[in-house]
């Protein structure tokens, strides 16, 4: 456990607290997948360091991935132009993303900020994963239910 806050939203957890939050958030996320806060907490409390480290290393070994890790761009209402995306031709990723956000009446900013990751190098990996998760749903044509979310996780 990190005894001190490593970043603004960081909530350091003792090992027992992490386990209990993981179990509780998983139970809540399964019974009510609309609880994005619990889905996020489950993902963070069950994310094991070696998995995040493997993703980080893979990103670092790729030219574009390395650039992402250096620049740390975010996907938010501030960085995307939703009106422009909505005007894109049908069949484009941007148009699919716009339709996805509209259909769910949501926005990129609705995703919770990472709180329970105790490693600064893994912080961006988890945040980026969370912000790009919708693209996986779109590419795999998966619904935003438990089965669709699980399928997207495996992908």
Curated annotation (Swiss-Prot):
<comment type="similarity">
    <text>Belongs to the COQ4 family.</text>
</comment>
<dbReference type="Pfam" id="PF05019">
    <property type="entry name" value="Coq4"/>
</dbReference>
<keyword id="KW-0831">Ubiquinone biosynthesis</keyword>
<protein>
    <recommendedName>
        <fullName>Protein coq-4.2</fullName>
    </recommendedName>
</protein>
<dbReference type="GO" id="GO:0005739">
    <property type="term" value="C:mitochondrion"/>
</dbReference>
<dbReference type="InterPro" id="IPR007715">
    <property type="entry name" value="Coq4"/>
</dbReference>
<dbReference type="GO" id="GO:0006744">
    <property type="term" value="P:ubiquinone biosynthetic process"/>
</dbReference>
């Amino acid at each position: 456990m990190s005894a001190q806050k490593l970043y603004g939203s960081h909530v350091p957890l003792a090992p027992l607290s992490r386990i209990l939050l993981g179990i509780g958030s998983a139970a809540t996320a399964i019974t009510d997948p609309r609880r994005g806060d619990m889905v996020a907490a489950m993902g963070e409390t069950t994310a094991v360091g070696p998995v995040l480290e493997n993703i980080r290393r893979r990103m670092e070994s790729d030219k574009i991935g390395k650039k992402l890790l250096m620049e740390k761009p975010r996907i938010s209402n501030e960085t995307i132009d939703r009106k422009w995306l909505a005007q894109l031709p049908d069949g484009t990723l941007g148009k699919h993303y716009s339709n996805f956000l509209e259909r769910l009446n949501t926005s990129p900013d609705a995703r919770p900020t990472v709180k329970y990751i105790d490693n600064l190098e893994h912080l961006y990996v988890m945040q980026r994963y969370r912000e790009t998760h919708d693209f996986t749903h779109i590419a795999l044509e998966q619904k935003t239910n438990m089965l669709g979310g699980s399928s997207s996780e495996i992908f």
